[in-house]
């Protein structure tokens, strides 16, 4: 057992080091770039070292615990700790954020503020995944909103203010329900309000109150995840944001909703989750079909990829709703798999858009000739997204399928019906992705392009793409590498559902 405050260092380092960016000399943005990359790499190395040498995979309990008083008046503690559920998400955050800072090199306007906001997001995300106090969890949840809003409104496209306002209204609206749920949990059944997750796991509630608390949290997570019909901020946001911001949104921000659903709703409110799980599975199945169909009708290729993200989130919802070891492990695998694939597709879409200055599919065509490297990587990651065997998307979706089929919670006919609907969604995925590839890269070469002298991917972009492609292939060939992180913790979590 390690008593060194590894997690506090991981949470505080990015935002503290990021605040020093403003004191760096104003001689171009080269120093700022390298400084930010160095901070992200240092954070990722500390993270990897701490988890390799101080985390036991076979132990399903919370590890690297830290507990110190923060605000004495409210008995508010700085409680951190990680287990198999949060380990993968923290490593994904470190990996994607490091590469997103590398992707942001072309940003020159207000680069100091831009990189500081990215590092502030980094701290908030690590803090959320390692929180062991519900109020701290809420604070970290809210810490994300301000950097994302500023990154959207200052470095976005033409309609950036509209999309930034829409994002903040949706997420702040969801956060109101979150705060009500947090206060309800903290004040119920005890003289001293306490929000320690260890205590709340053993707390029982009247059925009506538990359902109300569950529903309040579910709305907050439904906005972030997103779950239909609270998803409409996502295509607008991804359509306008800079591609490095899109990488953080698709790779990490959406996964915070899924993590919250597992960590709070499943773990703290098991009876309500047991009642809600059939509805989650139905919503997930509808979401897969609806978002895939809507994606097919999008003219803007960035929005098409955004709707594909919404569709893939349906598998996570079904995995969480299945209440089986296999299904929940599949959902966690899909969280990581889509984190890699979604982030890369937005990076590729952004770099292609930067070169051509076009986003509408009917204006595109024949780009594979001047940009063969981008074409190759776009095709490869599209195949990963449509669940080609040998890549992470295939394994994740297959495991979720098995989780649903083996679930004792559902009758045979509903399981067959939902599996059939999921299968239709999986057929629609190649239709919208391959048609996008055909319209963008094949056909006649473009002649009416605002910027005719575009070039192919440089070494920086290729390095970034290969770095993400390796884990996608690695997880696809040997998924046990990721499943071993969470399998014991998932088993311990689901024991609540079969003993209570």
Swiss-Prot record:
Q: Which GO terms describe its cellular component?
A: chloroplast thylakoid membrane
UniProt cross-references to InterPro entries, sorted A to Z = NADH_Q_OxRdtase_chain4, NADH_Q_OxRdtase_chainM/4, NADH_UbQ_OxRdtase, ND/Mrp_TM
Q: What residue ranges are annotated as transmembrane?
A: 4-24, 35-55, 87-107, 111-131, 134-154, 167-187, 211-231, 242-262, 272-292, 313-333, 334-354, 386-406, 417-437, 462-482
Query: Subcellular location, in the record's words?
Result: Plastid, Chloroplast thylakoid membrane
Annotated GO biological processes are: aerobic respiration; ATP synthesis coupled electron transport; electron transport coupled proton transport
Keyword Cell inner membrane present in the record's keywords: the answer is: no
Principal location listed in the UniProt entry: plastid
Give the enzyme class.
Answer: translocase
**Alphabetized UniProt keyword annotations:** Chloroplast, Membrane, NAD, NADP, Plastid, Plastoquinone, Quinone, Thylakoid, Translocase, Transmembrane, Transmembrane helix
EC numbers: 7.1.1.-
The family database entries (Pfam families) matched by this protein are listed as: Proton_antipo_M
Query: Which molecular function GO terms apply here?
Result: NADH dehydrogenase (ubiquinone) activity; ubiquinone binding
Q: Which reaction does it catalyse?
A: a plastoquinone + NADH + (n+1) H(+)(in) = a plastoquinol + NAD(+) + n H(+)(out); a plastoquinone + NADPH + (n+1) H(+)(in) = a plastoquinol + NADP(+) + n H(+)(out)
Q: How does it sit in the membrane?
A: Multi-pass membrane protein
- NCBIfam families, A to Z: NDH_I_M (TIGR01972)
Family stated for the protein in its record? Belongs to the complex I subunit 4 family.
| Name this polypeptide is given | NAD(P)H-quinone oxidoreductase chain 4, chloroplastic
Question: Which organism encodes this protein?
Answer: Sorghum bicolor (Sorghum)
């Amino acid at each position: 057992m390690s008593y060194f405050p590894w997690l506090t260092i991981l949470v505080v380092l990015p935002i503290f080091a990021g605040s020093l960016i403003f004191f760096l000399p104003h001689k171009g943005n080269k120093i700022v770039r390298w400084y930010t990359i160095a901070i992200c790499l240092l954070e990722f190395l500390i993270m990897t070292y701490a988890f390799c040498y101080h985390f036991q995979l076979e132990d399903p309990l919370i590890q690297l615990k830290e507990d110190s008083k923060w605000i004495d008046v409210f008995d508010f503690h700085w409680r951190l700790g990680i287990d198999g559920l949060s380990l993968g998400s923290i490593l994904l955050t470190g990996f994607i954020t490091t590469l997103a800072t590398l992707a942001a090199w072309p940003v020159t306007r207000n680069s100091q503020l831009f990189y500081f906001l990215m590092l502030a997001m980094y701290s908030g995300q690590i803090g959320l995944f390692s929180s062991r106090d519900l109020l701290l969890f809420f604070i970290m949840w809210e810490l994300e909103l301000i950097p994302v809003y500023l990154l959207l409104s200052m470095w976005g496209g033409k309609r950036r203010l509209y999309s930034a306002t829409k994002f903040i209204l949706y997420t702040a609206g969801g956060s109101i329900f979150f705060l009500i749920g947090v206060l309800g949990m903290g004040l119920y059944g005890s003289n001293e309000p306490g929000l320690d997750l260890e205590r709340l796991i053993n707390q029982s509630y009247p059925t009506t109150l538990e359902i109300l608390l569950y529903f309040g949290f579910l709305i907050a997570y439904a906005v972030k995840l997103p779950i239909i019909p609270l998803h409409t901020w996502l295509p607008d946001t991804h359509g306008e944001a800079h591609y490095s911001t899109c990488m953080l949104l698709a790779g990490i921000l959406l996964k915070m909703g899924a993590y919250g659903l597992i960590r709070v709703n499943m773990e703290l409110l098991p009876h309500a989750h047991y009642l809600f799980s059939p509805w989650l599975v139905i919503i997930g199945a509808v979401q897969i079909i609806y978002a895939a169909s809507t994606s097919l009708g999008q003219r803007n290729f960035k929005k098409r990829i955004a709707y594909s993200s919404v569709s893939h989130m349906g598998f996570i919802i079904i995995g969480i709703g299945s209440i089986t070891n296999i299904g929940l492990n599949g959902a966690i695998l899909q969280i990581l798999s889509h984190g890699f694939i979604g982030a890369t597709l937005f990076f590729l879409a952004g770099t292609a858009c930067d070169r051509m200055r076009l986003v509408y599919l009917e204006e595109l065509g024949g780009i594979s000739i001047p940009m063969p490297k981008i074409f190759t990587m776009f095709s490869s990651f599209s195949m990963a997204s449509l669940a080609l065997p040998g890549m992470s998307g295939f394994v994740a979706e297959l495991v979720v399928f098995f989780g649903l089929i083996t679930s004792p919670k559902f009758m045979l006919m509903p399981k067959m019906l939902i599996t059939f609907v999921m299968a239709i969604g999986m057929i629609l995925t190649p239709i919208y992705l391959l048609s996008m590839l055909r319209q963008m890269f094949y056909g006649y070469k473009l002649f009416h392009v605002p910027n005719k002298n575009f070039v192919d991917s440089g070494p920086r972009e290729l390095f970034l793409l290969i770095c993400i492609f390796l884990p996608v292939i690695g997880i696809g060939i040997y998924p046990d590498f990721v499943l071993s992180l969470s399998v014991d913790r998932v088993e311990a979590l689901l024991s609540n559902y079969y003993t209570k």
